[in-house]
């Protein structure tokens, strides 16, 4: 495993336990109505809503006659998305992550929910997945590609394992699209993004226009994007409120160590960058050509 991948695996191995109070068995942001006040109970509902909104955006049908046969979650965390989709759609779900600790957690959650035969989890490399071409009816990833250096290869690998007609769904942080005439972000913007990436072991962030550019030459159709930045912003004040108390700080430190504290420090920067229009939270979807 490459040094960068090992760092990502260790980051999640060390910090995963710190976030269960907010997210349960999920490790991604929640989807809120803009301007609402988030609470811990609401945050657990919001992470599930994020999955529903992403699948709805990709036109994944809940009709029993039209529903997908199976789904792959690339960067599956501790299995929350797979378990939710397996139960809701009554389909086979597979998750892949580079963190052995996350695989163990996901398998434990599956066993606790009686879903061992519906949801399976593999430890592996998202750039070289151990699945045959055209295997999955939905290929889903949320807040994983930010960790990947070769994002274009990551997307090609997602398309490879997607079946003809499959929905491909990417939900991720990124940055604003460049304005006409701009060749790159401003130096101070690059500095801000580097600070975020360094604290939470991200490789680099791209724009929704980059995703469209990488997808366009591939055998896909119906590419579309959405900006969901306003839908995640209500969580930031909740995290600050809970983390910047003695009880919250010590809990994060005990359960997640310095890795968890660095996430909180990064989120302070992320909140301002989102307010400034630099940081974006986006959804991208397309269909594998038949």
Swiss-Prot record:
Q: Which Gene3D superfamilies match?
A: Vaccinia Virus protein VP39
Annotated spans, SAM motif III: 161-170
A cellular component annotation (GO) from this entry: plant-type vacuole membrane
- What is an example of a GO molecular function annotated in this UniProt entry? S-adenosylmethionine-dependent methyltransferase activity
**UniProt keywords, alphabetically:** Alkaloid metabolism, Membrane, Methyltransferase, S-adenosyl-L-methionine, Transferase, Vacuole
State the PANTHER family in the record. GERANYL DIPHOSPHATE 2-C-METHYLTRANSFERASE, ZGC:194242
The name of this protein is Picrinine-N-methytransferase TMT4
């Amino acid at each position: 495993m490459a040094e960068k991948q090992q760092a990502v695996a260790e980051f999640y191995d060390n910090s995963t336990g710190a976030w269960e109070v907010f997210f349960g068995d999920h490790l991604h942001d929640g989807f809120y109505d803009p301007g609402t006040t988030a609470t811990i109970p609401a945050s657990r509902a919001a992470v599930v809503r994020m999955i529903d909104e992403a699948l709805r955006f990709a036109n994944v049908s809940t009709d029993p006659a039209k529903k997908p046969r199976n789904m792959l979650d690339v960067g599956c965390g501790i299995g929350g998305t797979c378990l939710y989709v397996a139960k809701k759609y009554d389909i086979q779900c597979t998750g892949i992550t580079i963190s052995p600790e996350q695989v163990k957690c996901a398998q434990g959650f599956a066993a606790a929910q009686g879903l061992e035969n519906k949801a399976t989890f593999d430890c592996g490399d998202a750039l070289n997945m151990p699945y045959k071409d055209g295997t999955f009816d939905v290929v889903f990833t949320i807040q994983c590609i930010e960790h990947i250096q070769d994002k274009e290869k990551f997307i090609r690998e997602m398309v490879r394992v997607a079946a003809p007609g499959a929905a491909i769904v990417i939900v991720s942080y990124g940055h604003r699209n460049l304005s006409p005439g701009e060749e790159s972000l401003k130096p101070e913007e690059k500095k801000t993004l580097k600070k975020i990436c360094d604290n939470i072991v991200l490789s680099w962030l791209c724009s929704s226009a980059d995703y469209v550019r990488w997808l366009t030459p591939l055998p896909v159709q119906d590419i579309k994007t959405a900006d969901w930045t306003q839908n995640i912003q209500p969580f930031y004040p909740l995290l600050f409120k809970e983390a910047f108390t003695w009880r919250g700080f010590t809990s994060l430190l005990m359960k997640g160590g310095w890795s968890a504290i660095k996430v909180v420090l990064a989120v302070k920067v992320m909140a301002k960058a989102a307010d400034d229009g630099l940081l974006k939270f986006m959804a991208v979807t397309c269909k594998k050509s038949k």
